[in-house]
Swiss-Prot record:
Disulfide bonds: none annotated. Rubredoxin is a small nonheme, iron protein lacking acid-labile sulfide. Its single Fe, chelated to 4 Cys, functions as an electron acceptor and may also stabilize the conformation of the molecule. Could be involved in hydrogenase-linked redox processes. Pfam families: Rubredoxin (PF00301). It comes from Trichormus variabilis (strain ATCC 29413 / PCC 7937) (Anabaena variabilis). Gene3D superfamilies: 2.20.28.10. Residues 11-62 form the Rubredoxin-like domain. This is Rubredoxin. InterPro entries: Rubredoxin-like_dom, Rubredoxin_dom, Rubredoxin_ET. One of its GO terms (molecular function) is electron transfer activity.
Length: 111
């Protein structure tokens, strides 16, 4: 299966630039009777933001949920940390802080 075919199966989220509302295709839009798993491109032309009633043109693609943040072309740089999701980065950062704290506390045990 090609990379392009894989990208098309993922449902991208779209964010309203006016109010910050995020349309998530997995949930749909119960206010306008939009079924779950409906891609943004298949929404009716007269669909508007449920919060501020902005048109579809006011939305920008923010990508699928749970993916690495940043531009796709930059994910290969660095030590591999760029490919981690935000939740994985939080675990890495706070885990390292906790280990560092435990290390410095363990120095009190030295005589």
């Amino acid at each position: 299966m090609s990379e392009q075919a894989v990208e098309n199966t993922v449902l991208d989220r779209f964010e309203c630039r006016s109010c910050g509302y995020v349309y998530e295709p997995e949930k749909g839009d119960s206010k306008h009777d939009i079924a779950p798993e409906t891609p943004f491109a298949e929404l009716p032309i007269n669909w508007r933001c449920p919060v501020c009633t902005a048109k579809k043109a006011a939305f920008s693609n923010i990508g699928p949920a749970g993916t690495a943040s940043g531009f796709r072309e930059n994910l290969g740089y660095g030590l591999g940390v760029n490919k981690l999701t935000p939740a994985q980065k939080n675990i890495l950062i706070f885990g390292a802080l906790a280990l560092g704290f435990l290390f410095f506390i363990s120095l009190y045990g030295l005589q």
